[in-house]
Every structure is written in structure tokens, then in C-alpha cells.
Amino acid sequence: MMAEAKKAAPKKAATAASKDADAKGPKHTPPNPKVRGRRKTRIGYVVSDKMQKTIVVELEDRVKHPLYGKIIRTTKKVKAHDENSIAGIGDRVSLMETRPTSATKRWRLVEILEKAK
């Protein structure tokens, strides 16, 4: 007795709906789509204002350790553009991400939230 050859199932005809979906793009949306034009904003403290039109701001980030649950505090220093040189050391400021204005500057001063005493 000879084994019967398995026949491949006939291909289904493409429907109009699937053709439209292929033309528009993927059928699902990526989980976290990056919205164009959204810029990061951060709040930090000015630690240096000795450069012309530039301030150094210390940004603090608090992250919970995944295993032990301890809150870990990390800091990062960034340079920000201060057009009128109005911010001073110790001021609490709001920054916004921007296009690179120099080799190391990618942030700009939005407003001074609290002046140093």
C-alpha cells in the first residue's frame, strides 16, 4: 500500500480588507510609540554658573531596586543653555531637552522655580 501524498491546503484568496491593512502598515501599534515633538523636561539644582550663557545642573533620579526594594538615588550633571545668564548657584530650575547647541549642551533653561537664599 502506497502512502498518499499530502496535498497542501489551497491558499485563501486575499480579501479587500487585508489588502487595505497591508497598504496602511502593520496591523498593530507598537507598545510605546514615540510621539514626535515630545521633549523631556527635568527639574534640578544649579551647581555652577561660571560659564557664559551656560549652567551646570544636577539632576536627581530615584529608582527602586528590583530585588531588594531599596530606593537608589543617582545624580547626573548636565550643561544647559541660559541665554540671559539669570540662574545662580543653588537655584531650583526647570530644563527642557533641545537640539545640541554645543558639543556637550543638549538642554535649555525653561524657568527658575525657586531662587537660592
UniProtKB/Swiss-Prot annotation:
Give the GO cellular component terms, alphabetically: cytosolic small ribosomal subunit
Q: Which CDD domains match?
A: Ribosomal_uS17 (cd00364)
Q: Does Membrane appear among the keywords?
A: no
Q: Please give one Gene Ontology molecular function term for this protein.
A: rRNA binding
Q: Report if keyword Ribosomal protein is assigned.
A: yes
> Organism's domain of life?
Bacteria
Q: Which SUPFAM superfamilies match?
A: Nucleic acid-binding proteins
Region: Disordered, residue numbers: 1-42
Which chain regions cross the lipid bilayer?
A: none
Which keywords fit this entry according to its UniProt record?
A: Ribonucleoprotein, Ribosomal protein, RNA-binding, rRNA-binding
Q: GO biological process: what's one of them?
A: translation
Entries under Pfam families matching the protein? Ribosomal_S17
The protein's job, in short, is: One of the primary rRNA binding proteins, it binds specifically to the 5'-end of 16S ribosomal RNA.
Against NCBIfam families, the record matches this protein to: PRK05610.1, uS17_bact
How is the subunit organization of this protein annotated in UniProt?
Part of the 30S ribosomal subunit.
Question: Could you say which protein family the record assigns here?
Answer: Belongs to the universal ribosomal protein uS17 family.
Protein name per Swiss-Prot or TrEMBL: Small ribosomal subunit protein uS17
